[in-house]
């Protein structure tokens, strides 16, 4: 309309990274496991759909971060043999999609690692298959740090560049475990001159406000957050760049058909 506005010009940039050899090898092992797990389902009741959602959840966690894979293992998989399995009368798609995929409903969305479908699928597995899955997730959790985690290394590079250009970035992550991992790694690599804080769904509204209030006292600052901050908190006053660590994805693209 020819009139100046108070809104800054939005610049969107996509960047790429290549997984390290160690992460690539792990991902290929996980992909093979997921394919075999779904194919091995007996098809009784909802078992195959449960395993399908478990496979997507495993892939999401491994691709998000080593910490997200480790969180599933720590929170749920140690209790494998105690689970009764998924309810045959329940709808797996309705039960698991709020955890695994991006949703528009704030009441359904969660930033916790999607361990429920993995736990329910594990209850249908024989012991060797359970042990194989646990070993994969343990191996994934060992790849933490920029040496083996190229996604983290690329993010560190981007954040350093933004800070050098006097930006104050937010790094958005899908899962709590990933956000805490990224914040810890960024703080370690960036040093004491930069303040890095994670704010996630594990914090109350008051705790979120307090953590952000403390953070904005620092000239060089990085906020790492999940979508818990998508509503109710005005971030534009104190931050002026965004990095999306976990992009929405289609499982059919990440998991090509054989």
Predicted features along the sequence, with ranges:
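Conserved helicase motor "Helicase C" RecA-like lobe of SF1/SF2 P-loop NTPases
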Residues: 174-198
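Conserved interdomain hinge at the start of the Helicase C-terminal
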Residues: 26, 35-47, 146-174
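Glycine-rich phosphate-binding "P-loop"
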Residues: 131-153, 199
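Conserved helicase ATPase core of P-loop NTP-dependent helicases/translocases
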Residues: 193-226
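Conserved RecA-like helicase motor core of SF1/SF2 enzymes
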Residues: 202, 221, 227-258
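Inter-lobe coupling linker of SF2 helicases/translocases
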Residues: 1-92
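Short glycine-/polar-rich loops that comprise or flank the Walker A/P-loop
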Residues: 10-12, 166-167, 191-195, 218-220, ...
């Amino acid at each position: 309309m020819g009139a100046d506005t108070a809104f800054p010009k939005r610049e969107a940039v996509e960047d790429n990274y290549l997984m390290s050899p160690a992460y690539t090898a792990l991902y290929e092992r996980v992909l093979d496991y997921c394919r075999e797990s779904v194919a091995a389902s007996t098809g009784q009741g909802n078992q195959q759909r449960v395993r399908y959602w478990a496979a997507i959840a495993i892939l999401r966690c491994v691709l998000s971060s080593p910490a997200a894979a480790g969180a599933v293992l720590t929170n749920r998989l140690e209790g494998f043999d105690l689970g009764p399995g998924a309810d045959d009368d329940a709808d797996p798609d309705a039960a698991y999609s709020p955890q695994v995929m991006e949703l528009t409903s704030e009441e359904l969305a969660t930033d916790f690692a999607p361990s429920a479908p993995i736990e329910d699928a594990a209850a249908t597995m024989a012991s060797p298959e359970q042990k194989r899955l646990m070993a994969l997730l343990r191996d994934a959790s060992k790849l933490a740090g920029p040496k083996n985690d190229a996604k983290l290394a690329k993010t560190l590079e981007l954040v350093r560049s933004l800070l050098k250009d006097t930006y104050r970035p937010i790094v958005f992550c899908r899962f709590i475990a990933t956000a805490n991992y990224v914040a810890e790694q960024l703080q370690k690599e960036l040093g004491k001159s930069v303040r890095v804080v994670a704010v996630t769904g594990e914090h109350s509204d008051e705790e979120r406000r307090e953590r952000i209030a403390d953070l904005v006292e620092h000239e060089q600052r990085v906020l790492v957050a999940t979508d818990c901050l998508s509503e109710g908190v005005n971030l534009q006053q104190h931050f002026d760049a965004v990095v999306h660590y976990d992009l929405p994805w289609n499982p059919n693209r990440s998991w090509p058909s054989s």
